[in-house]
């Protein structure tokens, strides 16, 4: 019976005319386009197969007539089949090509390059449930209130919920009111600023070998305020790319241009400043393309993009937008905006009109071999610059957020979705091009993009997602559902994924009551192992912060590019050298060792122990669980906790010297004469908790 079903399904699939985007484009990209695509330097025999005109002009493809299409003859040749290297096309792939050609060889544009179309449905749950129905699946039940409260707080603010807000929600069940309180919390801006700073390749040092300190933290603070103030995303974009060119821009607006001053500066003696200025411009182009357009523009700096619509010439037309800034690869990192007597920050500044540089195409990307001069412009495959837009960075920024742009809203909506569900509707967040992964729910993506584009309201978008039944689902999974949808791409259950590095640390400190609420200002230096900065030869030292600064959010921790903060690095945080569109997620022994040995976690554990003993002396382990996860343990969890408690007590009674080791990094919490209030008496073996 199973084989009959498989055969019938396969027959049904073959009966349909192949779809160009789903079936043919990936096949051509994999087997043909490297030699017969848009890159004129790599093109063989003058043949293009990525466009209808290119493929039909040479009769490689004769629409409706596969027998006379040379492409079929070449890929099926008995002794010299194409492609000349690698595996030849399978019988199934040949059959797909044949059916597609006989069906008219219809080429369609890549989905991401077409403007979003408004679908019939108008809600997130409509599209999710429709897809589930196609696969004969049903949504999971709604998670309990405590779980939802913790999920939303960690997603929106990066820390567990505050006691008052949690208690109110658990009592009245008004989730919308609770979510609004999270948006009003200043910690919301800190959470989403950190996500944006990954894209901005933010760090507190210049990078490269010397990696000297630089002052750019006011840009970090600007991003926090922008999210808390719900600055419309189009203005958020324009200020970061071109506030210095925007009429009537304020000092705060100018700080926003730090986005592209986060590029690295090489101050080592003997380096060519122009070489590294050129590298910085390329970085700005690649970063802009990925952050706003989901495009790998950096691939076109040496040759025309092999797969996506950006020629070698067009790369340098974009280069011209960024080639007119006053910054260069200089130790002073000028231009610098003086804010106060003790604070300054790096900003962008356009060159005067009579100082403007000429931009030339660099042969094979080598700045030492300049070719033809080009003027600033945008890729021809996309919409032109807005009619009244200037041909500078300001006009380019306006082009990015134009209603005609098919990508910016989609890419941005997808990024926000990804941070709430662990994966985007388009999994390849960094690549919406032809080599990327297509959307799991294309109509839903278009709906969210079109609605977001109306007013570019980030909080409204996030609220819409977290208020959906899809977001509220329980993350419990049955073996059958895990088998049918292991990656949860159909969203039949709530998301379950590891917290970001900063949230892992911050939620531990918050649960223990240690996390400082202090915002803004210069970076701080919580404890890190001695000697970590010895890899940097510039003589800088890590001066461990004292008091409240020791317990500030990880967002404020000093970031050195060549020597990342160890506990953040172990949980996959980037070092700021390049734009990080999405972090990898690993599970390694180093993470367990970090949570067991890093003083931040040890001090959090000590404070939590004290709270648990004080509030529930008869069952402190259960109270610990409730303080961290905001719910009582299940029977199975309680049994495991009880076993762990007994094992720990036995170990401490037999090895009292471990007490001193556990407390050695504590700065202000506990001293050895107070240990008896936290653990069973190691000398008498008493089991009761004091």
Regions found by a protein language model. Give the residues of each.
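Solvent-exposed helix-loop boundary motif
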Residues: 15-98, 102-134, 146-151, 157-169, ...
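Positively charged n-region of N-terminal signal peptides that target proteins for export
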Residues: 1-3
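Beta-propeller blade termini and top-face loops
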Residues: 192, 197-199, 203-215, 245-284
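Hydrophobic h-region of N-terminal signal peptides that target proteins for export
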Residues: 6-16
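Short metal-coordination and nucleic-acid-contact micro-motifs, chiefly zinc-binding Cys/His arrays
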Residues: 28, 288, 292-298
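Primarily short, surface-exposed interaction patches in extracytoplasmic proteins
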Residues: 122-187, 201-248, 278, 308-311, ...
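Short cysteine clusters
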Residues: 32-35, 299-303
């Amino acid at each position: 019976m199973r084989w009959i079903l498989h055969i019938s399904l396969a027959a049904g699939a073959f009966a349909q005319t192949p779809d160009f985007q789903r079936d043919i484009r990936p096949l051509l990209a994999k087997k043909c386009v490297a030699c017969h695509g848009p890159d004129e330097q790599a093109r063989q025999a003058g043949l293009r197969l990525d466009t209808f005109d290119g493929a039909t002009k040479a009769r490689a493809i004769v629409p409706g007539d596969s027998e006379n299409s040379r492409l079929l003859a070449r890929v099926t040749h008995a002794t010299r089949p194409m492609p000349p290297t690698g595996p030849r096309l399978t019988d199934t792939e040949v059959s797909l090509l044949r059916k597609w050609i006989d069906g008219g060889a219809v080429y369609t544009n890549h989905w991401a390059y077409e403007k979003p179309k408004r679908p019939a449905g108008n809600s997130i749950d409509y599209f999710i449930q429709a897809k589930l129905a196609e696969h004969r699946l049903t949504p999971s039940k709604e998670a309990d209130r405590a779980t939802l409260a913790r999920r939303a707080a960690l997603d929106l603010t990066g820390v567990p919920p505050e006691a008052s807000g949690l208690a109110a929600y658990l009592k009245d069940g008004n989730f919308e009111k609770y979510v609004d309180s999270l948006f009003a919390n200043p910690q919301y801006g800190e959470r989403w600023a950190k996500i944006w700073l990954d894209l901005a390749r933010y760090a507190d040092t210049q990078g490269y070998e010397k990696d000297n300190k630089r002052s750019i933290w006011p840009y970090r603070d600007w991003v926090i305020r922008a999210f808390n103030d719900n600055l419309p995303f189009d203005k958020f974009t324009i200020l970061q790319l071109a506030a210095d060119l925007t009429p009537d821009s304020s000092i705060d607006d100018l700080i926003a241009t730090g986005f592209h001053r986060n590029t690295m500066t090489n101050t080592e003696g003997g380096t060519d400043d122009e070489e590294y200025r050129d590298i910085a411009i390329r970085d700005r182009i690649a970063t802009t393309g990925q952050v706003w357009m989901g495009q790998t523009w950096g691939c076109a700096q040496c040759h025309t993009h092999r797969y996506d619509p950006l020629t070698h010439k067009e790369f340098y037309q974009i280069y011209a937008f960024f080639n007119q800034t006053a910054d260069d690869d200089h130790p002073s990192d000028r231009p610098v905006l003086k804010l106060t007597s003790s604070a300054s920050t790096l900003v962008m500044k356009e060159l005067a009109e009579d100082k403007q540089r000429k931009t030339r195409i660099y042969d094979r990307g080598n700045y030492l071999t300049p070719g033809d001069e080009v003027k600033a412009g945008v890729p021809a495959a996309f919409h032109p610059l807005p009619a009244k837009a200037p041909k500078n960075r300001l006009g380019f920024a306006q082009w990015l957020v134009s209603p005609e742009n098919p990508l910016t809203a989609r890419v941005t909506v997808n990024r926000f979705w990804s941070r709430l569900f662990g994966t985007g509707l388009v999994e390849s967040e960094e690549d919406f091009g032809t080599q990327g992964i297509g959307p799991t729910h294309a109509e839903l993506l278009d709906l969210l993009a079109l609605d977001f584009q109306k007013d570019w309201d980030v909080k409204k978008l996030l609220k819409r997602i977290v208020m959906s039944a899809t977001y509220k689902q329980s993350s419990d999974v049955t073996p059958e559902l895990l088998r049918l949808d292991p990656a949860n791409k159909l969203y039949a259950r709530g998301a379950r994924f590891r917290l970001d590095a900063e949230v892992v640390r911050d939620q531990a400190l918050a649960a223990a009551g240690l996390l400082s609420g202090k915002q803004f200002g210069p970076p701080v230096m919580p404890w890190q192992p001695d000697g970590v900065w010895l890899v940097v030869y510039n003589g800088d030292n890590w001066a461990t912060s004292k008091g409240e600064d020791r317990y500030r959010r990880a967002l404020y921790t000093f970031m050195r590019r060549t020597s990342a903060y160890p506990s953040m690095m172990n949980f996959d945080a980037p070092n700021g050298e390049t734009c990080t569109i999405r972090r990898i997620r690993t599970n390694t022994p180093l993470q367990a060792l970090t949570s067991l040995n890093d003083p931040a976690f040890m001090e959090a554990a000590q404070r939590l122990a004290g709270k648990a003993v004080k509030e529930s002396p008869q069952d402190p382990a259960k109270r610990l669980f409730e303080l961290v996860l905001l719910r009582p343990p299940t029977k199975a969890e309680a049994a495991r906790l009880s076993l762990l408690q007994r094992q720990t007590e036995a170990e401490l009674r037999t090895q009292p010297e471990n007490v001193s080791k556990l407390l050695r990094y504590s700065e202000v919490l506990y001293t050895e004469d107070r240990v008896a209030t936290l653990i069973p008496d190691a000398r008498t073996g008493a089991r009761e908790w004091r």
